[in-house]
Amino acid sequence: MKNITVKEMIKSAKENLTELSPQQVEANLTMQDVNIIDLRDTSELIENGIIPGSYHASRGHLEFFADPNCEYYKDFFNKEKNIILYCHSGARSALAAKTLQSMGYDKISHIKGGFKSWMKEVGIIVDYK
């Protein structure tokens, strides 16, 4: 088996992933059929805030929170909803999207450039509680 780099993994993940601009995500903030999920670690949320209305599922818990058959399942991972993922720069969210696709989620997208891009282009945040 060929070894691949994380850069190659991210590139591969993005090939089958819808990338949304921060402005496109901002337009979806109040939509009932959309769940925005922040994959950053808790310390990042405390330090930098979150996009309003987003849910938190750190990347390390993703598979457990997204599996309806797992005791740790979170109902904001709803296959009927459009799920928009984000992390700091878009790398973790691309990898997470690929994982969710393999788990049967087909309404997955992520913020191109992640939270960093969101802050530069939109800048609306709330404190994490």
Task: Please provide the spans of the model-predicted regions.
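Rhodanese-like catalytic fold shared by cysteine-dependent sulfurtransferases
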Residues: 1-34, 42-82, 91-129
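Short, surface-exposed ligand- or partner-binding patches at beta-edge/loop junctions that are enriched
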Residues: 86
